[in-house]
Structure formats: structure tokens, C-alpha cells
């Protein structure tokens, strides 16, 4: 090989020297007189230089092609002796080595029977991890790319050495231990899935008793060879899982499945159930049962708060009666606000909602309470519009007209029909004012149309233009909705008249570019939501009886209105003699802000 390289370089040098001597030969042959008479233009010089350079390039290319042809002729006889079906040993080793799942950075516990996120888990197993330095993948790539077995074997050992150096420099022993435990957990999950799939196949392929009665000859036949192999594999897998569980208990697992339910029960102060006591027992007795292979996801799904009594810090007779009505399906609701109001479950929310409805019904039978809630609503919106530097005159006129219409008994039947068409299932103060008007308005402001956001986020438009455009959009929407009303002069029509003054202010406050107005609107929303959360909290109000709950809601309303109106700079609606303190047996309200 060295002789060939020397021969090739000598030929290249001879060719280059020959081309370089051409100008010298021409000069010595024709003499200086001929070249002195010949004048070369710059263009002709470029042509001559390009011609010489191209000639050299063609010569080099031809020489290189000759060398490749010689190599193919020499390699052909050597490869002819090998069999086509054989594969080099390093490639087989690299393929036979089981590759560990690399996506261990995202830890999750999955049930073998659950079908959710199977596609995602497959993608994550294909995708290389950030910290992946697996010697198997590196070795397989080097073995396939290498042309000789010795080079592949050396690449395998080099890859292992590279992995060891990378892992030792990547983190300390503790982090490596955690990574190993995570990979061990993932291996356990895969083994559990394999066992569950095998058990499903066995259950699907087992003959029925009536089939054995019909065909006694076939029933008495021994198991076929594939079935016996499957059974033997399942037994080996069970023993492997049994050893793996004991190994996990010995060294401690990152996600103990048995203690998770017990810790959750201690947190919620729930009594120990039969399932939790069974999980406390040794796994040897229940190794072949499906309970051994429950994942943490199934444990959380099986633990539903509605199946257990909710922990009560004090007696709540009214709440317990309402909870019984909820279980019977006698408490309707338009929209579930379980998460927003911090309830344990939907049943908990519906039971408290039933009590709150009845409490407001008893409160509003008193004329003074009607005046109080009407005055508080008027003052809150007036203070909000004053903070936004808007005149509240038009709002006050529309608000008084809506109140006078709503307080007339002859309009209640029409109002009920209108609100039932909007999904309101109960004619209570909570369902109409707090839920249908306020909470729906906050939800609409959280998801504004894209066209409105495009105008408000345009840097080239002034704030006044944005405010005018937003107000025009609100008015046009309300005008279009007014045309579709079932009752042209009903409660919804009066509500739209109020919204024409309030909606642009709220929309520009929540979505506009003014930070001071946005802070005021955010505080307004926070107080309303916190007022409802306190109302649905067993520790802040008494659910012992409906009169006690009504009294606590009234005191809570006075306290919250004082906080909000004081922030807006408006005198409080409550008199000086009422300070909003709750009775002693109810406990302190604490800081409500």
C-alpha cells in the first residue's frame, strides 16, 4: 500500500512538473523575440490560465478514478468467499443487547391495563434522552458503520469507556442511583404490562366448560406447545417480578405505590378501607392477583371523595341533608364551579349550593336586605367606573330601571322564562346575579375574541383609539343580541342596557394597556371570587342550620363590601353599628384579602 501511494504521488509530481515546464519550453523554443512581439490581452491570459488549470484537474480526476477501479477489483474476490446470509459478530452482539428505555427523565407510573398515553410512551422510548449515553446504541452504530469486525469490537469497548467517563463526570453517585431506580421502575412497568398481556391472552384462549362437555376428546388433550411455552414464560415472569419487588423494597423505591394511598388517607383524615389494609399486607399473598399491579394512577382514580364522608370540622346538619338530596339527584345546576370555589367534589359543591340558595331566599324576604344588596351593587360599579374616569350617570339610570323591573311581582313569570332559556335552573340570587351575571362575565373576559386582542395589542394604535374601538365592539354585539330577544322589554333587555355602560369599562380594564385600571379590575374580581369561596367553605360559615348560614352570609357580604368599597374610595353601604364580625362559635374569619 505504501508503494502504491508513493507511485501515485510520483506520477502526480511528474505531471505537475510537465505542465509547469510548458511555458519554459515555449519560451526557449521560439525565443524571446517571438514573445516580445506577441501581446497578450488580459482576457487571453485568463483563457490560457483556465485551460492549464482544467488540464491539471482532468489529469488528477482520471488518476483518482483509476485507483478506485483497482480497489474494487481487489475487494471483489475477497467478499465472494463469504456467505450472503452471515452477519458479522459485533453487529449481532449490538442487536442482541436489550436497549434500556431512554426517556427516564419524565417519570410516570402507568397501569398495564390502561390504554392512555401508550402512543406517547412509545414516542418517548424512541426519542433519545438528553442524558443518554447508552453504550448499546453507540456500539450498534459503530458496528454497522465499521468495515471490519476488529474495528467494531474496538468501537464497542471505546463506547463503553466513553460512557463511563461521561457518567462519572455527569453527576455524583446519588444522582446515578436515582437514575438507576427510575430505570428499574420503568423495567417493572414493562414486566407488569407483559404479564397482564399474557394473562389476557390466556383468559381469551381458555376453553369454556360447555365446550369441554361438547368435545370431551379435545378437552382431555394436553396443552399445545405454544400454550405451554406461554405458561412457562408467565411463571418465569412472575418469579422475576417477585424478586424485583423484594429488591425494590430492600433498597427503597422512588415512588412506593403502597404508601401513596395511606399518606393520602392521612392527609384527608379518611378511615382505613379494606383496599388500603390489603395494600399494607405482604405482596406474597396477592402476587398473582391484579391488585399487585395497580399503578398510582389507578389508586388515585379509585379514591373518589364522593365515596367517602367529607371531613367536617364542626356539625353541619343542613349540609348533610343537602348531601343526601344530591345523592338522590334532586339538586339541579347550570354550571359546576367545583374547582373555582375550592370544593372537594361535585357532590360537595352541589350540597353547599343547595344550602346557599335557601339561605339567600330567606335573606331576601327582608326588605332591608334587598336594599342592602341593591345598594352594594350600585356602589361597587359606580366606584369602578369612577376609577376608570367614566361618568356613572347612564349606568345609574339603567340600573334603577332594572331593579324596579325585577322587584315587581308581575314580571317574575316572564323573567323566569327568559332565564330558563339561558340555562338558569333556579331563580335565586346566587344563580342569577353571582353565577349568571358575574361569573359568566369573568369567563368571557378570560377568553376574548381574537379580533379584539389584535386591536388591543397593536402598538401603532393609541390608547384612546383602542378604548373607542373596544366600546364600539361591545355595543354592536349587545345590539345584535337585543334583536334576538324573546321579550323585547324584559329582564335581559334591561340587563343589556346596564351592560352597555359596564362592559366596555371591564373589558378595557382587564384587557387594555393601562396597568392601574387593570390592577383595580383584578382586585375587583379577586374580591368577588374570594367572597364566593368563603361562602362555600365549611370553616368560614356555619352549615348547621339555614338561619345560621343566612346570618353568616349576610355578615360576610358586609365584610367583603367594606373591603372592596374602601379600596374603590366609596363609603360603605353598611351602617356604623354593623362591623361584620361573625359569632364566636363560628370562629374568626381571619384575613380575607
From Swiss-Prot:
Keyword Protease recorded: no
Record PTM text: Phosphorylation at Ser-295 of the FFAT motif activates interaction with MOSPD2, VAPA and VAPB.
A Pfam family per the record: Miga
GO biological process: bone development; mitochondrial fusion
Keyword Membrane appears in the UniProt entry: yes
Motif FFAT positions after renumbering to this chain: 292-298
Family, similarity comment: Belongs to the mitoguardin family.
The protein's name: Mitoguardin 2
Gene: MIGA2
